Amino acid sequence: HYCFFDYKKEQYGLDWNAIYDKYSRQIADDMTDNQLFEVLGNMLGELKDGHVNMYSSWDVARNWSWHENYPSNLSDTLINRYLGTDYRISSGMRYRILDDNIGYIRLQSFASSMGEGNLDEILYYLMPCNALIIDIRDNGGGLVTSAEQLAARFTNTPLLVGYMQHKTGRGHSDFS
């Protein structure tokens, strides 16, 4: 169900069928679960995609180089200076009122859902502020619905935020 085969082929010549052939030769009936996990993890690593992971009860196969080579777009020192330790936490958001009556929300991930009640409380607390900073730098992503839910609090107008494609068949390019 991977949607980026064509893109990866264009970007760096990925030939998934050749990769399949390469790694299928390394799989044997007498392999342990750990050995199979390692081979399949290495195979998925060929995709060079930080969003492709394989989970087992003992480990997660992931593309570490994607995370390690991802350019940092923030300074922990700067975050600590502004956010400090006197902040509130709700639904994965850290928030506080900064000097000059500026509201600040730090959102490092959209991995979990935000409760409407939690958002109500946070925004009510920050309502008297003269301005609001929503800091999503270094956000690892997650649920599109969480990002939409937060953004919807700042407009009354329906707004197109993107498109999604769904897998419709077994072929590499079978998407809606």
Locations of the language-model features?
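Flexible, low-complexity junctional segments that flank or bridge functional domains
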Residues: 1-176
